[in-house]
């Protein structure tokens, strides 16, 4: 019982991975629109490096959870049959295709057609990666607190909240501005509203879930307080992002960086609660 902090490597891996998948979609769409000058496009591609740094941190964290890099390779033995193997394989493919394509694009070795293909394929791989994360937990019918609609909603809402902000931050770092960027805060705000509703509904549902030895509501006694802090951090993060725009200013990169850090903190709290809610339907008591 607790807040799930003992699973911090998985918290980092899943939250960072979902934000990176969403952030890549934002940058890819900016490049696919075709209204950026060549030098601006190259700056956007250069700023994609931030995505791969975050993804690298996520994979390092996942290896710490597994204990050694060799276990990561061994976990690929059951691709197609194991949700965990599928998650690691899909994440590795997303990271490899995205990273190698980024390097070739940086070196200007991709033709316009190949670059377009790379962007589209990597966007799809990112979404598949997030879905494979969902399946690791949502396919376990003996864990009723994960075997529900709240798991896919929670994971994809992280992508819809963190992705637009991360993409906006990197586009700003690249010196890109445009009317389409103003749509990104609206996506994150909508995701935050939905996430708040999900938190309340999931909290109410916990009272109805129990095994012969355990009550789901007792797994994270501070569920309400933790989720409240999460929503507050997310709301502050989005306010820091949106407030300057309401006054007609472009948010500064340092302010956007603080905003993204606060968003990560909020989502890590939420993901910790998610792992803290692990329980089984049998006689075992989750620790």
From Swiss-Prot:
The lineage of its organism: Bacteria, Pseudomonadati, Pseudomonadota, Gammaproteobacteria, Enterobacterales. Keywords: Cell inner membrane, Cell membrane, Membrane, Oxidoreductase, Transmembrane, Transmembrane helix. Heterotrimeric enzyme composed of a catalytic heterodimer (DmsAB) and a membrane anchor protein (DmsC). It is a multi-pass membrane protein. Belongs to the DmsC family. Residues 33-43, 108-114, 175-182, 243-254 are cytoplasmic. GO terms for biological process: anaerobic electron transport chain; anaerobic respiration; dimethyl sulfoxide metabolic process. Its main location: membrane. GO terms for cellular component: dimethyl sulfoxide reductase complex; plasma membrane. It comes from the Bacteria. Terminal reductase during anaerobic growth on various sulfoxide and N-oxide compounds. DmsC anchors the DmsAB dimer to the membrane and stabilizes it. Pfam families: DmsC. This is Anaerobic dimethyl sulfoxide reductase chain C. It is found in: Cell inner membrane. The keyword Membrane applies. Residues 1-9, 67-89, 135-156, 202-224, 281-287 are periplasmic. The chain crosses the membrane at residues 10-32, 44-66, 90-107, 115-134, 157-174, 183-201, 225-242, 255-280. One of its GO terms (molecular function) is dimethyl sulfoxide reductase activity.
